[in-house]
Structure formats: C-alpha cells, structure tokens
Amino acid sequence: EPISPCKVAGGSVVESQSESLAETPLAALHRELGGRMVGFAGYALPVQYPAGIMAEHLHCRNAASLFDVSHMGQAELRGEGAAAALEALTPADVAGLKPGRQRYGLLTSPSGGILDDFMFANLGDRIFLVVNASRKEHDFGHIAAHLPQGVTLHRHEDRALLALQGPGAVPALAALAPGLAAFSFMGIGSFDIGGVNAIISRS
C-alpha cells in the first residue's frame, strides 16, 4: 500500500501570504503533490493534501504516512568532551549513552529551569541533536554559548527530516533497507535508502 504524504502535525498554522516564510528542502515536492501550503513555525508547510485530512488520518492509522518535519532543528556536537558538555546542560545521562542509541532529554537553564525538550543520539564520533522548531534558535544559541573549547556545534539547515508513522512504517522502510526490520526502539544508525545515506532512528 502506498505511503501517504501528510500535513505537518501539531502546533498552529497561519495562512497569511504576507509573512516571509522559509521553506524545507521538500517544498517543491509538496506543491507538486497538491499540498495546501500555510505558515507553521516560520516555514511554508502543507496543512493538507487533495485527499483531505480525514483520509490522511485514517491512512496513518491503518498503514503509514510520511510527515515533513524539516523545520525542526538538526545539529551535531563534535569534539572531545562533547558528551560531558551536553550533560552539563541536561539532567539526562549523555555520557552513558551507547553508540547507536538515542535518548529524550530536557534542556535546562543554569538555575535548573526547563527551557525545552529535545532528542539526542550517540553516533559514535559525534552527538546528533534534534530540537523543536519554534525554539531552535534559542536552543542552539544556548548550547553553543556553554560549550568548552574544543567542542563545536554544527547545524544542518539544508537537511530534510522526515517522520514515517503508522503500523506499516517498519515494513515500508525495511523493504528499502532490510536491516531496519530488526531495528529496536530508540535505536539510530546510517542506512542506504535508494543510494542516499540516511540517518534513521526509531522513537
């Protein structure tokens, strides 16, 4: 069964055409597929496709649907001491996270207040981060401001970020990369998808 392209999930949308909106790497494809583009967290994203929201909802519940979440913030922490540097900013256990695993965490202020939630993963030689769209400038600025010498933050503004959701998600991806069939919850790794190297996680 085909995978349905679906609207971005959560938050609020603004249909004003006067605002200056950023676009994800998949914006042209959304328009080609008939997506109705609206403003969401400063980006032009599809709120629905011609089949309608109900059809999209049911398809996601019964099969699998692909969501463009490229508006979220992606970055990597590199350098010796990267895990310790991030652990100083979150109560989550970063140093104890094994390669190929990811974890949910809270980004905190120096006084211990919660600034945002985020995901982080151990990719072996670097730590991969995903933060919320509406807070990414603040979050990445906060992280960068507290990094010690030798640890650097590298943002990935040009990368797409997709969420494949639904009971058919694993079979759909496993057909393209067989190793994904045995992928465990909160795992992450690099896979070849149609000749493209992709970082894929299950969360």
Language-model features and meaning:
Residues 3-203:
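Basic, glycine/lysine-rich polyanion-binding surfaces/domains
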